[in-house]
Amino acid sequence: MAYRMQGSILEVCTCKVLCPCWIGEDPDGGTCDSTVAYHVDMGSVNDVDVSGLTLAVAVHIPGNVLKGNWRVMVFVDERATSQQEQALTQAFSGKLGGPLADFAQLFGEVVGVQRAPITFAVEQGKGHLQIGTSVDAELEPYLGTTGAPTTLHDTIFSTIAGAPAYVGKAPSFKMTNTGLGIDVDIQNHNAIQGSFLFEG
């Protein structure tokens, strides 16, 4: 097995709540500008320990999420050693096969890879995501009648059977990237946090 990683995924985007991409439908307005961050709680790639690190992408999705042709900027946690950075980028680029190769097939163009300080401080849909000077998002979950966070199960992005994805919104979401031609500054749009397990 080339890799095994388990942790939390966070997606913030320009779609309204709830982002249609999570059930395979077209994004609101026909396109979607999004940040997807993967924080690895525990994991290794080719025997390189990558626990505690985060890899994120800023993406422009030109249509239905499953049709691909995404334009992508990759951000690697600045705390990663050169060996850890290489391991993470190899896995998430699909070069090591498995489910991450399926994910990487959605990429049409990778415009660059950058090291950046990444803050991933989110629990049950509430918290903060910051990626250098490129992304800053505050996150709030929706709550059900019992006061517990509203959740989704078995979405197209689910990799752990039965694991919840917490439905929320971003009171503030800012994302700028000249390589992607993105300049977003919006309020109260989609934010979803879930769990992932990748083995390949």
Regions found by a protein language model. Name each.
Residues 6, 29, 65, 120-122:
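Sterically constrained small-residue positions within well-ordered secondary structures
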